[in-house]
Amino acid sequence: MSHVRSAPAGKSGGGGGSTPAKRGRPFGSTTGSGAAAAAAAAAIGDAAAPAALVGPSLQVLTALSDQNNKRIVLALQSGLKSEILWALNALTVLSFKEKDDLRRDTTPLAKVPGLLDALLQVIDDWRDIAMPKDHTKPPRVRTLGVNTTLSGFGHENVEKVYSDTTTPSDDQTKTADSTVTKKRSAGFLFDEEGLFNVDDEGRTEKQQCAVAASNIIRNFSFMPENETVMVQHRHCLETVFQCLEDQNTEDDELITNMLETLVNLAPVLDLRIFSSSKPSFIKITEKRAVQAIMGMLASSIRVWHCAAAELIGRLIINPDNEPFLLPAIPQIYKRLVDLLSVPAVDAQAAAISALYNVAEVNMDFRLKLASERWAVDRLLKVVKTPHPVPEVCRKASMIVESLVSEPQNRMHLLVHENTFAEILTSEGKYSDTFARILYELTARPSNKVTAGQAIWGNIN
């Protein structure tokens, strides 16, 4: 999977040591090779330079002030390479946030009219422009920069030479309209769907702009003041879910940014927005959104299925989202239990966190989980195996305790009674939990028939 870049432009400019990327910090922002780092260095070195002496590609903003807001939005909407790169680099710096860093100078998206829409247009139009064509799909309509003669992306001059430059008269126009077969303009051969368009460089540059825009949206999603704006912005959520839907034809970096954006917004996200009266741009429904999440959960890429598991765990705690996730519970159950056997500790942690939340709110899930002996065995293995994050083992034991609380599950769980007793005597941290589990199994009135077989003796 490709390394996530924090800006579309910029070369390696330093050989200093790097620190590990943190959650809450853009991936690649600590390597010294991103444009954000270079731009920040330029801002520090030329802080006293007058703004009039530097062009749009050099001027670095230190805050989203009123005089800069409109200029950034217009730059994103221009379709010009120099303007878009300047705006994206500036926003990357402004949206950058260290872990646990309280940004007192942050400006909520709500106070920058049109900024979120401008970023979404860059993503919508250019997110897959450099990917191989799939001729089973209709051509994409791209409007960003369509009226710009020369934008600076790639090699644009070739098609201008071959395009028809003569303006037809009214009579010629009428004749052409009445003709059944029309002769296409030579410029068609060089446009995006044309036969001789080999401007891969321009396509790649545009797609990297979309990746950088997705990174900025991801950064903004870490700021609590932006949560409300983003979860109530239907176009934003539709774009994010459509990117997840098209994971096979998208840039890996862009998918990762969109998925992390959803994970950050999940605690306050209500899927009912897709059936609300808010204007829709892509026609995403609740069912399609859940299917997109399931596609990420089934992915073989570890970062994606871990994030998808975490996303499901956060979404289902909202009672309004539960009806949309219920049809996918069987697939969710199977995939989460499968992740428990993955050697990677982060995959186990994500699966346990999701299992814990789903088991807490859904009784059918608890019944299904307890009825599968191999699934309970994997949970107990997580409890018995030391984990770098003790909270994971604690949640695994609490999942087992929630299973015992269902009377229908006790007969299934009696099979594991010896293992429960072993953990009780050997794992001091979880002895209280497993003491309660054994008590539930052997001392409840519904279990008087099996109490004589319990290892604690007949306690009737």
Curated annotation (Swiss-Prot):
Q: Effect of gene disruption?
A: Embryonic lethality when homozygous due to defects in endosperm and embryo.
Which residue stretches belong to region Disordered? 1-32
Q: In which tissues is it expressed?
A: Expressed at low levels in coleoptiles, leaf tongues, mature leaves and nodes during the vegetative phase. Highly expressed in reproductive tissues such as young panicles, early developing seeds, embryos and endosperms.
Where does the protein end up? Answer: Nucleus
Keywords (alphabetical) are:
Developmental protein, Growth regulation, Nucleus, Repeat
- Please give the biological process terms from Gene Ontology that the record holds: anther development; chromatin remodeling; embryo development ending in seed dormancy; leaf development; positive regulation of DNA-templated transcription; regulation of endosperm development; regulation of nuclear division; regulation of transcription by RNA polymerase II
ARM repeat boundaries?
A: 225-267, 321-360, 364-405
User: Which PANTHER family does UniProt cross-reference here?
Assistant: BRG-1 ASSOCIATED FACTOR 250 BAF250, TRITHORAX GROUP PROTEIN OSA
**What exactly does this protein do?**
Plays critical roles in both embryo and endosperm development. Required for free nuclei division and cellularization in early endosperm development, by preventing premature cell death in the endosperm. Involved in the regulation of pattern formation and organ differentiation during embryogenesis, by regulating genes involved in the early stages of seed development.
Q: How does it assemble?
A: Interacts with CHR719, SWI3A and SWI3C.
Under what name is this protein listed? Armadillo repeat-containing protein LFR
Q: Which organism is it from?
A: Oryza sativa subsp. japonica (Rice)
Gene that specifies this protein: LFR
